[in-house]
């Protein structure tokens, strides 16, 4: 029951809900003017405040993290993997949605960062009885699943490297850092992006060098045993040799495994190299713009600001988006650092260029230069993700078409449908996405065969 002592708590929680503000003015305790909150309004407020849908819960978990008590057994579940930039350093969790739009959401929940120790969310349960996440503020429970660690993780390649040091699953996708450490880490003083820990992870928790053969064997095992359809390759800044270095990996995976292949590298000034990349059959290209505000871009990404500049990221993105199938290119940005208005502008700009916005909620990763920065607020991040959906809808960006791709590191555009207002435009866009997915099935089936198979 609401009382004056608990009012501040409920008011703050209500401010994070879409509709609660119209029910309970922020300036008033339980007496509003001369009348009390009705039982109906009180129940509505409690429901709005305590029950989040799966996408809202995903956002709040990204912002607040999760506590794992010592008596909760995690035997057999995927371990915490500090690979690549360090963003996947959390616990892999599957959230059922109860929605026909999307059945489940895969998310990588922060658990080791300092802010997670203060999280109101707590994991409970065990493998045999099932797991759930409890919100200790209101004792609300969300049933979840924890994916098992695949057997191939501990298998060795023919080159003698354990496969989980070549690549790891992030959601249902395989992530592999193919290049040596991003060159920005080699400058004195270092010019690395301040949120990144690639320089600490590559060569420590994952292999420093990954041969084409080792990558192919790992991809083949992940496809055969984990059912993956997509592998994401990235490698940071490697001077002018980034795409040239990546081409043999892309070709080998397409020829010998048959997967959808995505590539994320620093932009290059010779755009003909992107034509060479497209000729290999690469399925997805992404560009990490990170921030739209020039001052924040220079402050947080000194190497990118000095060597590339923001303009090159956008020019390369536009070039690829104009030449690849719609929905094949993405622009990646970080929300929760620069002013939210600039994040909205970045989302609109990326969608206007024909790409889909991939928005990462800022995570102050352990070991990074920003590990002591605060995690962003839920309400602002929810607003950002609603904006993602609306931008994709306005520009008819086809999202979520590829089969069996669930990315756990970010809130994906197709997941944001669970946040969107149910307008006529919403239903038209969702119908468009379903028809597009149906039409794209033969294309994806062909791209998931080896090159030799569909040439024959």
Regions found by a protein language model. Give the residues of each.
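Conserved AdoMet/S-adenosylmethionine-binding subsite of the radical SAM
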Residues: 216, 220-223, 230, 234-376, ...
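Short N-terminal secondary-structure initiator segments
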Residues: 126-138, 164-181, 229-242, 296-316, ...
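N-terminal [4Fe-4S]-dependent radical SAM core
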Residues: 102-192, 199-205
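"Short basic amphipathic alpha-helical interaction patches in structured regions
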Residues: 190-196, 209-211, 246-248
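Conserved alpha-helical substructure of the radical SAM core
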Residues: 200-232, 444, 456
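Extreme N-terminal basic, low-complexity initiation segments
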Residues: 2-6
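Auxiliary Fe-S-binding modules of radical SAM enzymes
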Residues: 7-136, 140, 344-456
């Amino acid at each position: 029951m609401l009382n004056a002592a608990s009012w501040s708590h409920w008011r703050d929680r209500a401010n994070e809900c879409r509709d609660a503000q119209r029910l309970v003015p922020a300036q008033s305790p339980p007496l509003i003017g001369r009348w009390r909150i009705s039982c109906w309004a009180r129940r509505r407020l409690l429901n709005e405040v305590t029950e989040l849908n799966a996408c809202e819960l995903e956002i709040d978990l990204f912002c607040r993290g999760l506590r794992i008590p010592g008596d909760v057994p995690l035997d057999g579940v995927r371990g915490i993997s500090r690979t690549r930039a360090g963003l996947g350093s959390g616990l892999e969790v599957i959230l059922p949605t109860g929605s026909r739009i999307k059945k489940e959401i895969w998310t990588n929940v922060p658990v080791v960062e300092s802010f997670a120790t203060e999280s109101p969310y707590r994991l409970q349960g065990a493998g045999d009885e099932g797991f759930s996440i409890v919100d200790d503020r209101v004792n609300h429970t969300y049933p979840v699943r924890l994916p098992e660690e695949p057997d191939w993780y501990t298998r060795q390649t023919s080159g003698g490297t354990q496969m989980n040091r070549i690549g790891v699953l992030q959601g249902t996708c395989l992530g592999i850092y193919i290049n040596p450490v991003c060159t920005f880490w080699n400058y004195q003083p270092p010019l690395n992006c301040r949120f990144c820990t690639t320089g600490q992870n590559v060569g420590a928790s994952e292999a420093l060098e990954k041969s084409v053969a080792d990558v192919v064997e790992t991809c083949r095992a992940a496809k055969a045993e984990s059912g993956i359809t997509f592998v994401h390759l990235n490698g940071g800044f490697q001077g002018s040799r980034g795409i040239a270095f990546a081409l043999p990996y892309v070709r080998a995976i397409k020829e010998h495994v048959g997967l959808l292949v995505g590539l994320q590298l620093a932009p290059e000034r010779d755009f003909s190299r992107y034509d060479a990349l497209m000729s290999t059959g690469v399925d997805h290209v992404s560009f990490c713009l990170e921030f739209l505000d020039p001052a924040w871009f220079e402050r947080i990404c000194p190497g990118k600001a000095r060597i590339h500049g923001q303009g090159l990221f956008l020019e390369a993105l536009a070039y690829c988006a104009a030449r690849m199938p719609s929905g094949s290119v993405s622009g990646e940005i970080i929300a929760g650092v620069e002013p939210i208005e600039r994040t909205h502008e970045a989302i609109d700009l990326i969608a206007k260029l024909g790409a889909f916005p991939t928005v990462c909620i800022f995570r102050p990763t352990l070991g990074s230069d920003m590990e002591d920065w605060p995690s962003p607020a839920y309400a602002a991040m929810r607003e950002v993700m609603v904006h993602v959906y609306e931008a994709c809808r306005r520009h008819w960006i086809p999202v979520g078409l590829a089969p069996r791709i669930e990315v756990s590191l970010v809130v994906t555009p197709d997941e944001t449908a669970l946040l969107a207002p149910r307008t006529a435009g919403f239903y038209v866009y969702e119908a468009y996405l379903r028809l597009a997915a149906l039409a794209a099935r033969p294309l994806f089936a062909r791209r998931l065969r080896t090159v030799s198979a569909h040439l024959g």
